[in-house]
């Protein structure tokens, strides 16, 4: 059975697509951003508007974060956490 150009080209393109898909996947165990992020900042947003202002402050830093006022013992500080 002869392999014609009509069959060979789609076959090669399919193989290249499959190989590139495998290399681009990030399902490898132990890699990626799976941990929780928590970064606390000044208490200013919490003083200005509580959790709502802290939320706006964190979303402005990154759309992947949410804000929460957390008491650190003496005052509320604005902490940005992962969603």
Curated annotation (Swiss-Prot):
Record bears the keyword rRNA-binding: no
Alphabetical UniProt keywords: Antimicrobial, Disulfide bond, Fungicide, Plant defense, Secreted, Signal
Superkingdom assignment: Eukaryota
Signal peptide stretch: 1-24
Disulfide feature: 40-80, 46-69, 54-78, 58-79
GO biological-process terms attached to the record: defense response to fungus; killing of cells of another organism
Localization, UniProt: Secreted
GO cellular component: extracellular region
Primary localization class, coarse: secreted
Homology family: Belongs to the DEFL family.
Name this polypeptide is given: Putative defensin-like protein 111
Source organism: Arabidopsis thaliana
